[in-house]
């Protein structure tokens, strides 16, 4: 029997098994806590300070992106408003008063 093929079936059996022990072994094998360095000491995950710095950087980036979107929408709306006012003024200039404006009869109420 080919040893590589047997290893593949063991891995498939590990993932297809319904027991909690097999799932626990799979999770334990793939976490950062299980990494061992060359000198035999286990290397832990990222420390608390670097996690805090990463979180602050993520918040700052999200704030900058949010402000960019808000101001982009605001200035786009202002630009469209200015253009629409210009188009209205253009239409108003082309309109001429009717000759019938002077012929309005005002009666008693």
UniProtKB/Swiss-Prot annotation:
Keyword Nucleus tagged: no
Localization (cell): Cytoplasm; Membrane
Keyword hit for Glycoprotein: yes
Keywords: Cytoplasm, Glycoprotein, Membrane, Phosphoprotein, Transmembrane, Transmembrane helix
Biological process according to GO: regulation of cell cycle; regulation of mitotic cell cycle
Topology relative to the membrane: Single-pass membrane protein
GO cellular component terms, semicolon-separated: cytoplasm; membrane
Disulphides: none
Expression triggers: By p53/TP53, following X-ray irradiation.
Modified residues (Phosphoserine): 98
Residue ranges crossing the lipid bilayer per the database entry: 56-76
Additional record remark: 'Reprimo' signifies stop/repress.
Protein name: Protein reprimo
Organism this protein belongs to: Homo sapiens (Human)
Lineage: Eukaryota, Metazoa, Chordata, Craniata, Vertebrata
